[in-house]
C-alpha cells in the first residue's frame, strides 16, 4: 500500500481493477480545511486521462508492474514492433503507448516495456541516447560562448534545443527524461 501523499509523476497504482499512472500531481494545503492531493491520472490500459483528488492519508494499492527490456524493430505506420530478446516474440504497440519514447528511439535500440497483468501499457526509452542532428540552422560566428539555444531536428524526427555551436550532421547525447541536449559525442 502506498499513501496518496507519496504520489509522484510516474507512480503506478491499482484502483477498481484498473492500473493508473500519475501524470501530474499537486499537494494543496488551503488556509482553511484539510490538505489534499490533486492528481491527473492516466489509465494505463485505455489511455483515458482523469483528474482526481485524494486525502493525503488515503491508502492506494500499489500495482505490480513487470518491466522487460525489448528491442525496437520497426513501424508499419500504425503499429510499433518490439522484440523480446529471450523468446524472440514480437509485440505490436499503438502510438499512444509509445508516444513519449518513440521520439528518441531508432530501429534496433533497446527500450523498457512496462506490463500489467501481461498487457503492455508503456514504453520507456533509455535515459540517455546518442542521435544524429538531421537539420539545424548554422550558428553565427562569434556566438559560441553565450548560452543561446537554437532548435534542431534529430534523425528520429524529434525537435530539441541545442547550443549555437552544434551543427547539422553531428551526433549528440540527449537526456530522454527531459528531452534536453547533454553534450556532443
Swiss-Prot record:
Gene3D superfamilies: 2.30.30.30, Nucleic acid-binding proteins
Top-rank taxon, per record: Bacteria
SMART domains: EFP, Elong-fact-P_C
InterPro entries: Elong-fact-P_C, NA-bd_OB-fold, Rib_uL2_dom2, Transl_elong_fac_P/YeiP, Transl_elong_KOW-like, Transl_elong_P/YeiP_cen, Transl_elong_P/YeiP_CS, Transl_elongation_fac_P
Signal peptide: none
GO cellular component annotations of the record: cytoplasm
Compartments it resides in: Cytoplasm
An individual GO BP term: peptide biosynthetic process
Recorded metabolic or biological pathway in which this protein acts: Protein biosynthesis; polypeptide chain elongation
GO MF terms held by the record: translation elongation factor activity
Annotated PANTHER family: ELONGATION FACTOR P, ELONGATION FACTOR P (EF-P) FAMILY PROTEIN
Family the UniProt entry places it in: Belongs to the elongation factor P family.
Job description of the protein: Involved in peptide bond synthesis. Stimulates efficient translation and peptide-bond synthesis on native or reconstituted 70S ribosomes in vitro. Probably functions indirectly by altering the affinity of the ribosome for aminoacyl-tRNA, thus increasing their reactivity as acceptors for peptidyl transferase.
UniProt name for this protein: Elongation factor P
Organism: Clostridium botulinum (strain Hall / ATCC 3502 / NCTC 13319 / Type A)
Protein's gene: efp
